[in-house]
């Protein structure tokens, strides 16, 4: 599985997938192997490499199990920029979001993680994306990460204010280090998402919230 170079669960982007060798030199992995197409229904795909999806145990065993649903096939498509995480007030009261930005801890209970779909989205893709969100209960499991999303929003405000970016650029020059705007964002936010890859848990959430 290591040749697939998958470092986080492709279904949820919440758990690391680690490959290692045991004492006997056998390759092991922390991932479960999900049969994208259930072998009981599609026996011809049972041993197909392209039907094996390394995923976390929660997504594979607890969420999906033997359920067969129209979802995104990770090797070919993901949410990308077509489906993005967002943070919304449950009662559509924008004041709750503002209170959270100002540090009101009680206001976070009135917020929820949701998804936004880009306009003119292909209907079949949208169905598969909605199927993935429903099957893996992404709204529910990401609810615990609301505080992280708010933290990203705060860091976005710090970056857009301008002085942090200027300070970091000056510091890097003094250290004779090259630093792009993207590098500065990486340092501030603590996530790396160059080339559209999400190699760290929650990096998709972080990118979507930061560039909201």
Residue ranges and their predicted role:
Residues 38, 48, 56, 71-77, ...:
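Alpha-helix initiation/capping motif
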């Amino acid at each position: 599985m290591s040749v697939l170079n998958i470092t986080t669960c492709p279904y949820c982007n919440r758990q690391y997938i680690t490959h290692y060798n045991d004492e006997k030199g056998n390759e092991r992995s922390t991932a479960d192997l999900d049969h994208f197409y259930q072998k009981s229904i599609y026996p011809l795909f049972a041993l197909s490499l392209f039907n094996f999806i390394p995923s976390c145990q929660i997504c594979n065993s607890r969420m999906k199990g033997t359920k067969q649903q129209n979802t995104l096939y990770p090797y070919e498509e993901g949410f990308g920029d077509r489906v993005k995480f967002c943070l919304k007030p449950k009662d559509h009261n924008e004041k709750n979001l503002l209170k959270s930005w100002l540090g009101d801890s009680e206001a976070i209970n009135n917020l929820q993680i949701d998804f936004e779909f880009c306009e003119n989205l292909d209907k079949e893709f949208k169905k598969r994306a909605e199927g993935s969100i429903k099957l893996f209960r992404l709204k529910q499991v990401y609810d615990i990460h609301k505080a992280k999303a708010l933290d990203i929003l705060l860091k976005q405000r710090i970056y857009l204010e301008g002085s942090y970016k200027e300070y970091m650029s000056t510091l890097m020059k003094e250290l004779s280090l090259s630093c792009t705007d993207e590098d500065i964002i990486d340092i501030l936010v603590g996530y790396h998402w160059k080339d559209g890859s999400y190699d760290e848990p929650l990096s998709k959430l972080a990118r979507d919230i930061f560039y909201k």
